[in-house]
Every structure is written in structure tokens, then in C-alpha cells.
């Protein structure tokens, strides 16, 4: 074992690439308050239905529209130093997969017009990320082999076969616009259209 360890070289190969995203995940929030639990449930149901209709009208598939949370709770106010329940509040979120980034700004504007109160998160991604990652892994192996060859040649040895590989995680998603709040008003009708600049995704892979 000692001899085998003495004849091994441990190196780390790295490969990186920046790519333009071609899809996004959009998390929309609907928040309402009312006197009764039934009233807030009704309000949210009506807004959710309008938002879904708007999304379907923009060619967003039903399969790409998912409810991700639904929280109903008492709404309190402070009266003379004491908390007094004045009604109920309900928050729900929808997670939307957007395959056409050109539609992203219009989707946000249209759903806000239909009652969405929060854009909680926008994350950009690459539909073919797994293919890019496989290419980067191969490049990382080549990078590691080149480093090992330099060390072996410097020591007067020939490089043999790779004995083991430890693959690290990689990151290929970027998030923007977390916690953006929207208030419906007359001014919103003349506001400039929402524009988001996705930039590039940094994907990396390493082999050790």
C-alpha cells in the first residue's frame, strides 16, 4: 500500500464555461386580507383563476404552472397594547416555468395586472445544462491529466492510468428580483414594461 501511494499523483482538474440561459422559473405571490377565512379564500381563488387564464393565454402550459404554498392565518392588530384579531390573511405562491425568455417581462406585467402582489423570485437556467456539464467534466479530466503529466515528466516518470476521480458539484442557476413587491394602482397602467436582463450562467466542473 505504501509503495502504491508513493507512485500516485493527486491533482485537480477544472473546467468552466459561461452560457446564456434560455429558460426561467418565476415565483409569484398573491396576498390578501379580509374579515373572514372564507372571504380571503374566495379572493385568492378568484385571483388565482385570473392569473392562470392569463398565463394560458400567453401560451404557458398548464404543466408549467404549479402551486407551491398556501398559508392561511389570523390577522391581528394592536389595540391599546393588546393584540386583537381583525380578520384573516392568506398568502399563496405559484411557480411558473418560462421556456421563452422574451415573454418573461410581459408575464410579470400581465399577472400583476390580474392580481399578483409579489414577484418573490426569478431564476434563470439552461435547458441543456446536463449536456454542458458532461462536456465540462470531460474537459476537467483532460485538465487534470495534463497537470499530472507535467508532474510525472518533471520527476522522470511516465503517466499511468487514472486510479480514482472525485467529482465536485457545479452551479448553473442565477437568481434575481427576490422579494419584489407590486402594488396595483392607476400609475401602474402607464408604467414602463418590466425588463429583466438574465446575463450569463457560470457552470463549472472539477475532478480530483
Locate each region found by the language model.
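Short, charge-dense linear interaction motifs
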Residues: 1-114, 118-208
Amino acid at each position: 500500500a505504501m509503495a502504491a501511494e508513493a507512485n500516485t499523483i493527486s491533482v485537480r482538474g477544472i473546467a468552466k464555461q459561461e452560457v446564456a440561459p434560455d429558460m426561467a422559473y418565476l415565483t409569484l405571490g398573491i396576498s390578501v386580507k379580509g374579515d373572514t377565512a372564507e372571504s380571503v379564500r374566495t379572493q385568492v381563488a378568484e385571483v388565482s383563476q385570473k392569473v392562470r387564464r392569463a398565463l394560458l393565454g400567453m401560451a404557458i402550459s398548464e404543466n408549467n404552472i404549479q402551486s407551491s404554498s398556501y398559508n392561511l392565518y389570523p390577522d391581528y392588530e394592536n389595540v391599546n397594547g393588546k393584540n386583537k384579531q381583525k380578520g384573516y390573511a392568506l398568502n399563496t405562491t405559484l411557480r411558473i416555468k418560462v421556456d421563452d425568455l422574451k415573454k418573461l417581462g410581459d408575464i410579470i406585467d400581465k399577472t400583476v395586472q390580474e392580481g399578483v402582489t409579489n414577484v418573490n423570485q426569478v431564476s434563470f437556467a439552461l435547458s441543456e445544462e446536463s449536456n454542458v456539464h458532461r462536456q465540462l467534466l470531460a474537459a476537467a479530466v483532460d485538465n487534470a491529466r495534463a497537470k499530472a503529466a507535467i508532474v510525472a515528466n518533471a520527476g522522470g516518470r511516465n503517466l499511468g492510468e487514472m486510479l480514482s476521480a472525485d467529482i465536485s458539484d457545479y452551479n448553473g442557476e442565477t437568481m434575481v428580483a427576490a422579494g419584489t413587491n407590486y402594488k396595483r394602482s392607476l400609475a401602474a397602467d402607464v408604467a414602463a414594461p418590466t425588463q429583466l436582463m438574465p446575463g450569463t450562467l457560470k457552470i463549472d466542473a472539477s475532478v480530483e
